[in-house]
């Protein structure tokens, strides 16, 4: 028989940097989850992701206070800031003020990383999705309609 689920916790934690301090500790403590055990397993699971990138995680908490979790890829806006804007933030007025240029190759690279979490049917649709996010951040997009 399957374990009874008592709740889900959605957090965004920096890859490889989970620790018991807020927001992780209080969120898990409310559900009676072993915080140290979660932090160790999360840091192990995210060792392939660049350290410090915010990584969404969905934690499933069971009635016997055990847990399982699924890590997602970092948000597209974070990846665009990292690869295209080199750490700068997006534009406050994206339609009038452009803060950078993204090539099709950069968008394709980000789309390949995000493919498991996107609902896009193929790579081309994923590229268009990432291009839309880039435009909304004030980034000029080249090579994508």
Curated annotation (Swiss-Prot):
Entry-linked PROSITE patterns: RIBOSOMAL_L11 (PS00359)
Keyword match RNA-binding: yes
A cellular component term, taken from the record's GO annotations: cytosolic large ribosomal subunit
Gene Ontology molecular-function annotations: large ribosomal subunit rRNA binding; structural constituent of ribosome
SUPFAM superfamilies membership: Ribosomal L11/L12e N-terminal domain, Ribosomal protein L11, C-terminal domain
Record's comment on post-translational modification: One or more lysine residues are methylated.
A Pfam family per the record: Ribosomal_L11_N
Keywords of this entry: Methylation, Ribonucleoprotein, Ribosomal protein, RNA-binding, rRNA-binding
Presence of keyword RNA-binding: yes
Listed GO biological process terms: translation
Database matches in HAMAP family: Ribosomal_uL11
Protein role: Forms part of the ribosomal stalk which helps the ribosome interact with GTP-bound translation factors.
Subunit note: Part of the ribosomal stalk of the 50S ribosomal subunit. Interacts with L10 and the large rRNA to form the base of the stalk. L10 forms an elongated spine to which L12 dimers bind in a sequential fashion forming a multimeric L10(L12)X complex.
Family, as annotated: Belongs to the universal ribosomal protein uL11 family.
Official protein name in the record: Large ribosomal subunit protein uL11
Phylogenetic placement of the source organism: Bacteria, Pseudomonadati, Pseudomonadota, Gammaproteobacteria, Legionellales
Gene that encodes the chain: rplK
């Amino acid at each position: 028989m399957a374990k009874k689920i008592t709740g889900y916790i959605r957090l965004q934690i920096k890859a490889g940097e989970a620790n018991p301090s807020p927001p992780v500790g209080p969120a898990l403590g409310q559900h009676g989850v072993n915080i140290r055990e979660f932090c160790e397993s999360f840091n192990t699971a995210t060792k392939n992701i660049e350290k410090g990138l915010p990584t969404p995680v969905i934690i499933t908490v069971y009635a016997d206070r055990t847990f399982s979790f699924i890590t997602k890829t970092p948000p597209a806006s974070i990846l665009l800031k990292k690869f295209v804007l080199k750490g700068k933030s997006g534009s406050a007025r994206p339609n009038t003020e452009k803060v950078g240029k993204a090539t099709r190759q950069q968008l394709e690279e980000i789309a390949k990383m995000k493919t498991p979490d996107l609902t896009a049917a193929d790579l081309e649709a994923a590229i268009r999705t990432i291009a839309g996010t880039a435009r909304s951040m004030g980034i000029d997009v080249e090579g994508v309609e």
